[in-house]
Amino acid sequence: LHPYGKTSEVQRRQMTTVQADNVLNIAVDGNFDDCQDLVKAMFADAPFRAEMNLSAVNSINFARIAAQIPYYVYAALNLGAPEREVAVSVPTGNFGNILAAWAAKQMGLPIVKFIVASNRNDILSRFLAENDMSVKQVEPSLSPSMDIGVSSNFERLLFEFLGRDALLTAKTMADFRSSGKMAVDAPVSCTHLRAHETV
């Protein structure tokens, strides 16, 4: 799925000209969040998922995030890790790629700072800078992959923020979905995340 009219022509062609029997791309009248909501709903429907033999290669599938972890290990080693600490700055909308960096840190990689770079769709930057995760209208930009109102993978980090309490995480996310806003007291172990808004 892709948001109709909200990708570049090159991106649209990459998605819509694949000639494979097991690939079907559909343009959705909406934004990237609408596409993600539809995909999540399909994956939540277990009988449908099994009947259609669905798979996803975006960051909804944790395998994609796991596959990105070696990028950070490779980069850090080339910068002198483990003897030298490193910082990473990652343009992000859906929080998947930087979540891979965070996972690498949990495995022992000496990352001392994470800089979350965003465009005008800055829900992550606002949350990290001001503890303000409130949903706003998505504004189209020159970086459509970052034009996201709600970062799908943030729930995975929230699980860590909330002491790996699955019930509290589920309740917090349900409250967020109904109210459109969230504030969380992050533990000290998560304070090395920083926001940076791109120009």
Residues of each region from the PLM?
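Short, conserved catalytic or adaptor-binding loops enriched in Gly and charged residues
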Residues: 14-20, 43-49, 162, 189-190
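Aromatic-anchored, charged helix-turn/loop surface patch used as a conserved interaction hotspot
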Residues: 180-190
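Long, charge-rich alpha-helical interaction segments
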Residues: 174-180
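Domain-scale recognition of functional cores that engage charged ligands
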Residues: 36-41, 46-105, 109
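Glycine-rich phosphate/pyrophosphate-binding loop at beta-loop-alpha junctions
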Residues: 1-36, 87-173
